Amino acid sequence: MDKKTLEKYSSAFTLSDMEIFIFPDLLYALVLANIMSPEIWKWREDPWFTGIGKMGPLKKIHRVKQYVMEHYNFNLDLETWGLTDKQTEINRFNDFVDMEMLSRSNALFGYEGDKYYFDMDIRRHFGLDKFDSDIIPYWKTETVEAMNAFRYKPNHQAGAGECVSLACLYAAALFIVAEVPLEKIFLMGTPLHSQNFIMVDEGVLTNNRRIVTKSMWYNGTELSALARRALEHEQVTYIAHSSGWIHSMYPEATIDTVEYQLFREKLTKYLQTTIDFEIFMNFLRDYSRHQKFFQLCFQCQGANRFIQLEKAFGYEHGSKNRLGDKTGRKLYCEMDEEDLYLQPIDHRYRIYHEDELFELKPYQAFIDSLKNSFPGLVQHAEFFADLKKFVHTVPHLPSTKKEFTVARPIKISPGQSREEIITYLSSIRHSSFVIRHSESTSLIADLAFYAGRYMDSCDWKPFFKAAFERNPVSVEHFRDTDLQAVHAQLQSWPNESIYDGNRLALPDEVVNYLRGDGIEKAITLVNVAKARHLEVSLEQHNNMITVRHGKLKFDFTTVKKSSYIWNNLPIL
């Protein structure tokens, strides 16, 4: 296995943001690993999803969203997966990655973010300013098992994960529970965020735990503004799909060209809208600095009333009614008489719902009508620039000028069982631990078994490389503890793995979630010892794993029943 292949396959276990950025095959591999996991299939038995089969596609997606909202939190801290440094990671990748291009595209290697995205520097935003500038976080993308296991961490009552974890969770859940075909799901990554675009109805965007329909994209709320900012201000670095991937940094791409073109068309349509009174009011809700130009006019008891627009919007706070939509008239009734004028307010443009200006129009037709109605607005160029940005986002997608190569697409359907899917994915992997691929096999399918920790059928060398090189949290946790005390503390934790069968957790998962099978605890102890440059060995006798260091002997009991595990322990 050459250096690049070994790094790629070991990265399938740790799945840090930088590893997924450099090896785009890994993103969809995690989606498939989550689909193969029994965890999301259990959701189908939850009473919340009773009758979901009779629901329409969009309602199914909303149902999944509510489940995700109730069972998972967003988590992006520095403590869970620990820190590394730029030079260590550069040494891993510099033989096969253009580091200058990487620094322009990846937040951890120098990307500064769009000026509109943060009003402070990125390192301060993420809490890295207290460390040397060379220090960067691992930010590992969690499997569904690792996400679920957050509930075992102190001060966590639910599952959790960062944005890429949530995107991969959503993709798998929409396939398994909402029965959305994989062909309709596109995963998108920017230097600072990860979202999915689902080609259902007019389009649905996932954003961390939430979803954003087209109408929500234009509702002008704070939540929609948060969902919009990545696509408004950042380059979409890579896109992953069941047919393959495309990446702005690489000249080659494997995504199906027809599927990619369809995605571009659907996303572009999602990101532009015609304008009526509701859309215009939503724009002014989002870009509140322009409210000062307008007054709202409406009829009350047979006479016109006028109110400064910013005061009118103030009444939305604490009310379920909103200006611009069908509940707007109810909001008028909630306004205090002392804020209402009987005569038009000087120097403000009058807007009212019934004005033919607000009959549904394409953007340019609306702008022409607006300038005709309010000539004085023409001098405020920033107003028109913001309006255009609000109603028409131009996504910065990877160029189609790539060397497209044919990759075997993943052909599974929501009607298949978990067992059928695992059998199919197994059939299109390589047939031995020698990692070779042809047009009849799928690299992504193969990597999915590594991401899912199916150690019965994976080469252990990448696993041990990941376990002993990129699990700093377990090392730090036991920093001031001698090996006997490390063993005692590991033994005090529940002897249960977060992964079923013979799948294995990494040392930092054991320490984060305070539990593990005996072999996982043994590997954690070895990781701590190796970090101290101590010589250790592993032995197995039936269900007993023994770690030896000099005259010291540490026993662990395992219920993992794979003979292949024992055959590979000597690789240490």
Label the predicted regions:
Residues 1-433, 437-572:
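A structural boundary/capping signal
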